[in-house]
C-alpha cells in the first residue's frame, strides 16, 4: 500500500528539460547566438488519467491488504484453537494417566498376592506406558503449534491459551454470505475499477503532446573570428518563444496498449466470476460442515459425556472390589478415553468450521 501511494507521485512526471546552446560567429547579436530551453509535456488529460489509474491501484492494494489480513487472522485463530484442542487432549490423558497408574499398582499388588495372573499386571503396565507415549506426542504437537503461532504473530514470547478449557466458539451471523461485500469480492471489484482506469489511461495516448521553447541571447563577444559587430541587444536578452503540438499520426502502438488493457480487464472479470462461484460453493460446504459438527457436538454434550464419567468411576470401584475382571475394566477405561476424545474432536471440528465461515464472511 505504501509503495502504491508513493508511485502516485509519478502521475505528473514531465520529460527532461532540454537546454541547447548555439553560438554562430558568422552573425552578430542575433537569435543564432543564444540558449534555447525546451520542455515537452503530454496533454493535461493524460496526467489526469494516469493519476486516476494510480489512485485506483492504490485502493486495490488496500483491499488486497484487507484480504491478506483476513487470511492471517483465520490462520492465527485456526492455530490458536488447534493448540487449545491439543491442550485439552493433554488434560484428558493426564487424568487418565492417574487412573491407569492406580490400575497398574493394583494389578501389581494382586499379582504379587497371587490373586491374579501376570498377564493382568503386564496389560495394566502396557496401558499406562502407551498413555504416556500419547501424552508425549501431544506435548510435542502443542510445542509445534506454539512455534507456529509465535511466527504468525511475529513475536519471540511463548503464547499460551487464555482459556483453561476447550469450548465451542459462539457462532453469530453465519447464515448468509454476500460475495460482493466480502473482502475477496471488494478486492476483485477494486481490481476491475483499476483496470478500467488503466484502459482510459491507455486511450489518452491518442491525445496530442505539447512543447514549449524559450530562447534567450548569449553572445560570446571575445569570440569573433570574422571581425563583425557581435554586440548584444541593449533592450534585453529575450528572443521569443515557440509552442508546438505533437500529433500522433502513427498510433498502432497505442491501439495495441488499449487492446491489451481491455484483455486484462476481461480476464480479471472472468477471474472474479470464477472466484465468486468457488467462494459461494465453499460457503455452502462450510455451512453443511458446521451443521454436522453442531449435531455431533450436541450428541456428546447431552449424552456420552456424563455417561463416560459414571462408567469410569463405577468400573474403578468394582475392579478394586474384585467385582469385574481386568478385561472388563480395560474396556471401561478405553471407552472412557474414546468418549472424552470424541467429544474434544467434536468441539475442535465445530470450531474449525466456524473459523472457515468467518474467514469467508469477513467476521474475524
Question: What feature does the model see in each segment?
Answer:
Residues 52-55, 118-127, 259, 326-334:
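Short, charged, amphipathic alpha-helical segments
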Residues 1-11, 68, 72-91, 109, ...:
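Amphipathic alpha-helical coiled-coil segments
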Residues 16-53, 213-253:
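Small/polar, glycine/serine/threonine/aspartate-rich low-complexity segments that form flexible
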Residues 1-17, 22, 41, 49, ...:
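Bacterial Sec-pathway N-terminal export signals of envelope proteins
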Residues 39-41, 62, 87, 140, ...:
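Residue-level signature of outer-membrane beta-barrel architecture
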Residues 71-183, 286-289, 293, 336:
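Periplasmic alpha-helical coiled-coil/stalk elements that build and connect Gram-negative outer-membrane
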Residues 14-16, 42-44, 73, 203, ...:
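Outer-membrane beta-barrel channels and translocator barrels
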Amino acid at each position: 500500500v505504501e509503495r502504491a501511494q508513493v508511485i502516485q507521485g509519478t502521475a505528473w512526471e514531465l520529460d527532461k528539460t532540454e537546454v541547447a546552446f548555439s553560438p554562430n560567429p558568422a552573425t552578430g547579436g542575433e537569435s543564432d547566438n543564444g540558449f534555447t530551453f525546451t520542455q515537452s509535456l503530454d496533454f493535461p488529460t493524460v496526467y489526469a488519467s494516469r493519476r486516476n489509474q494510480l489512485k485506483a491501484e492504490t485502493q486495490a492494494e488496500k483491499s488486497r491488504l484487507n484480504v491478506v489480513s483476513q487470511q492471517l487472522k483465520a490462520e492465527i485463530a485456526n492455530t490458536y484453537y488447534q493448540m487449545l484442542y491439543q491442550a485439552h487432549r493433554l488434560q484428558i490423558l493426564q487424568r487418565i494417566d492417574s487412573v491407569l497408574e492406580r490400575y497398574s499398582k493394583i494389578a501389581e499388588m494382586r499379582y504379587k498376592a497371587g490373586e491374579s495372573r501376570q498377564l493382568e499386571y503386564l496389560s495394566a503396565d502396557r496401558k499406562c506406558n502407551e498413555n504416556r507415549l500419547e501424552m508425549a506426542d501431544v506435548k510435542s504437537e502443542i510445542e509445534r503449534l506454539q512455534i507456529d503461532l509465535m511466527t504468525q504473530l511475529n513475536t519471540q514470547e511463548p503464547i499460551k491459551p487464555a482459556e483453561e478449557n476447550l469450548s465451542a466458539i459462539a457462532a453469530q451471523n453465519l447464515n448468509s454470505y454476500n460475495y460482493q461485500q466480502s473482502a475477496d469480492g471488494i478486492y476483485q471489484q477494486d481490481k476491475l475499477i483499476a483496470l478500467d482506469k488503466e484502459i482510459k489511461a491507455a486511450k489518452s495516448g491518442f491525445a496530442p503532446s505539447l512543447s514549449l521553447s524559450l530562447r534567450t541571447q548569449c553572445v560570446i563577444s571575445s569570440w569573433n573570428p570574422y571581425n563583425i559587430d557581435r554586440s548584444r541587444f541593449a533592450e534585453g536578452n529575450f528572443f521569443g518563444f515557440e509552442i508546438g503540438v505533437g500529433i500522433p499520426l502513427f498510433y498502432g502502438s497505442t491501439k495495441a496498449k488499449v487492446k491489451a488493457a481491455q484483455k486484462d480487464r476481461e480476464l480479471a472479470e472472468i477471474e472474479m466470476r470464477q472466484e465468486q462461484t468457488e467462494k459461494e460453493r465453499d460457503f455452502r460446504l462450510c455451512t453443511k460442515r458446521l451443521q454436522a459438527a453442531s449435531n455431533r457436538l450436541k450428541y456428546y454434550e447431552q449424552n456420552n459425556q456424563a455417561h463416560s464419567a459414571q462408567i469410569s468411576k463405577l468400573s474403578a470401584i468394582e475392579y478394586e472390589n474384585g467385582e469385574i475382571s481386568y478385561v472388563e475394566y480395560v474396556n471401561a477405561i478405553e471407552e472412557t478415553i474414546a468418549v472424552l476424545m470424541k467429544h474434544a474432536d467434536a468441539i475442535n471440528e465445530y470450531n474449525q468450521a466456524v473459523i472457515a465461515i468467518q474467514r469467508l464472511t469477513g467476521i474475524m
